[in-house]
Regions:
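Conserved N-terminal structural module of periplasmic/extracytoplasmic solute-binding proteins
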Residues: 1-115
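Loop/turn elements at helix/coil->beta-strand transitions in domains of secreted/extracellular proteins
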Residues: 48, 82-85, 104-107, 160, ...
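C-terminal capping/gating helix-and-loop segments adjacent to ligand/active sites or protein-protein/ligand interfaces
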Residues: 66, 301-349
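Structural recognition of the beta-strand scaffold that forms the well-ordered cores
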Residues: 88, 107-111, 163-165, 172-175, ...
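Extracytoplasmic ligand-binding clamshell segments of periplasmic binding protein
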Residues: 93-96, 192-254
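Hinge/lid segment of periplasmic solute-binding proteins
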Residues: 111-173, 254-257
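Non-transmembrane alpha-helical segments in soluble domains
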Residues: 177, 186-193, 222, 226, ...
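Extracytoplasmic/periplasmic substrate-recognition and gating elements
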Residues: 246-308
Length: 349
């Protein structure tokens, strides 16, 4: 055996000895591991605890509840994050205002246009529209990564983005066809809009009536219209839904519906408190991204609300909602600003 062969033999012998010495230790560690338990145990989260979500109800959908819709999205987020809990609370504007005056503020807030002034909310930088897998929300063809659709600038406070619109309602004309025809109703609506009546006070009306070539017609409030009084009223999708349910139970007269105009003051926004802790932001961003996803946005149609994601499938069971939201989509740039909208303006709390 020459020198080279002796060297190789020595190296191999050393390797065999090391293997024999350390194999039992390595095998012992592997035998001590419970790999099944490791597989079941969730990954450690950056944050564990409660994320508070308020849904401030400024208007109601045709049917169902936006609060319940948000709760389902929260449940999905909880399943993805062990130890993270979303508490979703639906409250009125008056209840929310009382809480704000008392110094309370949630981590995430869903609010109607004009309820907040913007300074209470965190400045958004686009990371809020990225989902769990790090991909951006799909807003459809024509929108690049992180690019917001037309109309989303209504969440701007000056030059900063502080809220994102996620749903919109509409104004409708409800009328009794035995008292006023659809053609006459169309003429009345034209008269109302041409005389500068704002969309905000369209349902706070007088009973002075409106004249047309065919005669004079009495306009009532939604509540009076439900009792069969007046010839027509201006209401929202919930008013139409309530009337349909009453009519189905033979508790209201047959009525018909036409879109009131191509504008609305019923827009719901989502924002993040300026005081929300940084470690919560990952879960919150995923929650908001899910709200804006095409799949979740399409679900709003079953509530009778218009989704704000252009990629969402817009299918409404009621033809008058299809027509009303079709008109609204054409004037999407006219949505009210989140902080200076038609609803009551409020100072900072």
């Amino acid at each position: 055996m020459n020198g080279f062969q002796k060297t190789i033999a020595a190296v191999l012998l050393a390797a065999v000895l090391l293997f024999m010495i350390y194999l039992p230790k390595c095998a012992g560690k592997m035998l001590e591991r419970d790999q099944y338990r490791e597989w079941l145990e969730p990954e450690e989260e950056e944050f564990s605890g409660v994320i508070n979500v308020w849904h401030v109800v400024g208007f109601k959908p045709y049917m169902g509840s936006v609060g319940a819709w948000l709760k389902k999205i929260a449940d999905r987020a909880e399943r993805r994050h062990f130890g993270v809990y979303f508490e979703v609370e639906s409250i009125s504007e008056a209840e929310a205002e009382a809480k704000l005056q008392n110094g309370e503020f949630p981590d995430v807030i869903s609010f109607p246009a004009g309820f907040l002034n913007g300074r209470e909310l965190r400045i958004m930088n686009g990371t809020e529209i990225f989902g769990i897998d790090g991909t951006v929300v799909d807003f459809g063809d024509g929108y690049g990564a992180g690019e917001l659709p037309a109309g989303f600038d209504c969440g701007m406070d000056g030059r900063t983005l502080r809220a994102l619109p996620f749903a919109a309602g509409c104004k409708l004309a409800l009328f009794y066809p035995e008292r006023v025809t659809a053609a006459e109703m169309t003429e009345i609506l034209k008269h109302i809009t041409e005389n500068g009546e704002s969309k905000a006070d369209a349902d706070s009306c007088s009973n002075d009536g409106f004249g047309t070539e065919a005669g004079k017609f009495e306009r009532s409030s939604v509540d009076e219209f439900k009792k069969g009084k007046g010839d027509f009223c201006i209401g929202d999708a919930r008013a139409a839904g309530d009337m349909e349910r009453l009519a189905a139970a033979n508790k209201a007269k047959y009525f018909e519906v036409l879109p009131f105009c191509n504008e609305t003051d019923e827009v719901q926004f989502v924002g993040i408190s300026a005081k929300t802790e940084r470690e919560k932001m990952g879960c919150i961003s995923e929650f908001i991204a899910d709200m804006l996803s095409a799949a979740r946005q399409s679900e709003l149609c079953t509530l009778g609300l218009m989704p704000m994601n252009p990629a969402a499938e817009k299918k409404f069971e009621q033809s008058f909602l299809t027509e009303a939201y079709g008109l609204l989509s054409e004037s999407i740039l006219n949505l009210p600003n989140a902080f200076t909208g038609a609803a009551a303006r409020r100072a900072a709390f």
